[in-house]
A protein has these predicted regions:
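Amphipathic HAMP/coiled-coil signal-transducing linker helices
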Residues: 23-42, 74, 78
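Conserved long alpha-helical elements within nucleotide-processing catalytic cores of c-di-GMP signaling
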Residues: 41-60, 70-97, 107-111, 115, ...
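Nucleotide second-messenger and two-component phosphorelay signaling modules
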Residues: 49-60, 64, 75, 94-105, ...
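A short glycine-enriched loop-to-beta-strand structural element that forms part of the catalytic core
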Residues: 108, 142-193
Length: 203
């Protein structure tokens, strides 16, 4: 009986310890959360990547970025842009929930940049669904005339008027099991050229 009691106490201690660790992580995420989207911010993202690399288990890091975003900001203003960012966050969250994988992670780097961490096959599926659903969610934020034309007229960096395409989304995916990359920065640096290349592709 004494042994059983000890086992029960040991199990409770372990359970409370695990609960305390989870609460600490949640607290850190809340403190670091984006005020706009409520998603975990840069510190939580960095910690999540570090944990995955340390675990030596294969995962995919997906960097989500919006194209033609700066001209949209200049044309429509920051208040309206904030609504677009929140809508993008809702789209990403919806696809993450559809995947039904609580171990997956979604973070907001800031501005129009987001991060998804998931298992490789699931990450690819999530990203495909995000791309497929993106246009339908974003077009409503344009004026009817711009929506119908498929572009809007704004000013470039030199102040010249020109046509700008509607916002699209680019997602760069990097996969590792801790063998190639040692730090979150290593992964981010590897994702950057992939993202820039993807932005040059049509569609």
């Amino acid at each position: 009986l004494r042994l059983n009691r000890r086992d029960e106490i040991g199990s409770l201690v372990h359970a409370f310890g695990a609960m305390a660790r989870r609460l600490k992580i949640l607290e850190e995420r809340n403190l670091d959360a984006s005020p706009l989207t409520g998603l975990p911010g840069n510190l939580a993202i960095e910690r999540e990547i570090e944990n995955r690399l340390t675990a030596k288990k294969t995962f995919s890091l997906c960097h989500v970025d919006l194209d033609n975003f700066k001209p949209f900001v200049d044309m429509y203003g920051y208040a309206w842009v904030s609504e677009v960012i929140k809508e993008v966050a809702r789209l990403l969250l919806a696809q993450m929930k559809t995947a039904e994988a609580p171990e997956d992670f979604l973070g907001h780097i800031g501005g129009d940049d987001f991060v998804i961490i998931s298992a490789p096959l699931r990450a690819e599926r999530i990203c495909r669904e995000i791309v497929a659903g993106f246009d339908g969610r974003i077009r409503k934020f344009y004026a009817a005339q711009d929506r119908e034309r498929g572009f809007f007229i704004g000013k470039d960096r030199q102040g010249n008027q020109q046509k700008f395409p509607l916002i699209t989304v680019t997602i760069a995916i990097i996969t590792d099991d801790g063998a190639r990359f040692g730090t979150p920065l290593d992964m981010a640096e590897a994702a950057a050229p992939l993202k820039e290349y993807a932005k040059t592709l049509p569609g």
